[in-house]
């Protein structure tokens, strides 16, 4: 129960920091950057019902996506240890990688190179690449330190268990059994670190995506975004759900993590609707704030997708035993990246 509370506190802290970061974005827009009021797609009255549809549709698809892996152990052909689940997980990892490279990173480049920003310093230094690079390195540090702390805690707990009489029975087990237990324990710790860090990264960019959709009154843009984001959230949820499943959390913690993933984007949309009259997505402050958040999120998602998800699976024993399965998983990952690349046309 304590770990669940800690996890909830982490998520609330991230959401609070994002709120403070976005609040200065309520500012004036330079005349040359103002939206063309004669555009037939700009209609606040028609946009509101579409945004409400978006909240419901994205909430439902997010719940389906993140919940599907959690119930897969009850479906024989989708068992977490099976080949089909591995292929689906690689596809979902490809979705996350495609999100970082084809959606979040380009958005950051576009925002931080906007003509609405001053030449000095925004047009004289590649801030997006720099911040994304730092984000990847910081994620590596967090990943490493968190794993180290989890491992030390597990070793301490194991030492306490050794002081009990139960160790007499355990010592009679074959060495290979104890080694296997130790290996499984270390792998479980890695899964838990991955699930936590990935969820925090997804929450950051989900709030930004939702805010952008909620703040815009462009009905043409909203219509395309609804379908694209439903697809995106469903399969990104499958990737996260697979990590949560492998982490073997308690049912309460699984529910908490799934709940926060499902409601983050709809909450961002609701926040965008509330701020739509004062929030200007092309104001300098908004461009800088959201652009830097996107760069941070992109670095984190790219690192997690490549290092903690795809590389970990491809170098794992299951895929290393079968070249055919490796090719199938590579094709699935490529398909996931390709799907997000196609969606980049609309979202």
Curated annotation (Swiss-Prot):
InterPro entries: ZIP, Zn/Fe_permease_fun/pln
GO biological process, any: zinc ion transmembrane transport
Transmembrane portions of the chain: 52-72, 84-104, 125-145, 193-213, 225-245, 255-275, 287-307, 327-347
Pfam families: Zip
Membrane topology, Cytoplasmic segments: 73-83, 146-192, 246-254, 308-326
Topology Extracellular: residue spans: 28-51, 105-124, 214-224, 276-286
Cellular component GO terms, alphabetical: plasma membrane
Family of the protein in this entry: Belongs to the ZIP transporter (TC 2.A.5) family.
PANTHER family named in the record: ZINC TRANSPORTER 8-RELATED, ZINC/IRON TRANSPORTER
Protein name as it appears in the record: Probable zinc transporter 8
Lineage, top ranks: Eukaryota, Viridiplantae, Streptophyta, Embryophyta, Tracheophyta
């Amino acid at each position: 129960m304590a770990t669940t509370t800690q996890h909830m506190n982490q998520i609330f802290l991230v959401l609070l920091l994002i709120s403070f970061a976005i609040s200065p974005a309520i500012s004036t827009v330079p005349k040359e950057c103002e939206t063309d009021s004669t555009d037939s797609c700009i209609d606040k009255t028609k946009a509101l019902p579409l945004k409400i549809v978006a909240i419901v549709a994205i909430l439902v698809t997010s719940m389906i996506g993140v919940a599907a892996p959690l119930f897969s152990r009850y479906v024989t052909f989708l068992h977490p240890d099976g080949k089909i689940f591995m292929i689906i997980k690689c596809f979902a990892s490809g979705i996350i990688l495609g999100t970082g490279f084809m959606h979040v990173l380009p958005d950051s480049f576009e925002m931080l190179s906007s003509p609405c920003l001053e030449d000095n310093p925004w047009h004289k230094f590649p801030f997006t690449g720099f911040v994304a690079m730092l984000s990847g390195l910081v994620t590596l540090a967090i990943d490493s330190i968190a794993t180290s702390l989890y491992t030390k805690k597990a070793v301490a707990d194991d030492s306490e268990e050794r002081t009990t009489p139960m160790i007499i029975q355990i010592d009679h087990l074959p060495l290979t059994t104890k080694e296997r237990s130790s290996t499984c324990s270390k792998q479980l710790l890695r899964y838990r670190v991955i699930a936590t860090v990935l969820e925090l990264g997804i929450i950051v960019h989900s709030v930004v995506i939702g805010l952008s959709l909620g703040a815009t009154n462009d009905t043409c843009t909203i219509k395309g975004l609804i379908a694209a984001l439903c697809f995106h959230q469903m399969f990104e949820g499958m990737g996260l759900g697979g990590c949560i499943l492998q982490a073997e959390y308690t049912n309460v913690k699984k529910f908490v993590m799934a709940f926060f993933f499902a409601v983050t984007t709809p909450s961002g949309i609701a926040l965008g609707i509330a701020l739509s009259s004062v929030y200007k997505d092309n104001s300098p402050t908004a461009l800088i704030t959201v652009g830097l958040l996107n760069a941070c999120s992109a670095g984190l998602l790219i690192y997690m997708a490549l290092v903690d998800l795809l590389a970990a699976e491809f170098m794992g024993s299951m895929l290393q035993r079968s070249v055919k399965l490796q090719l199938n998983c590579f094709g699935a990952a490529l398909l996931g990246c390709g799907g997000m690349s196609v969606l980049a046309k609309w979202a």
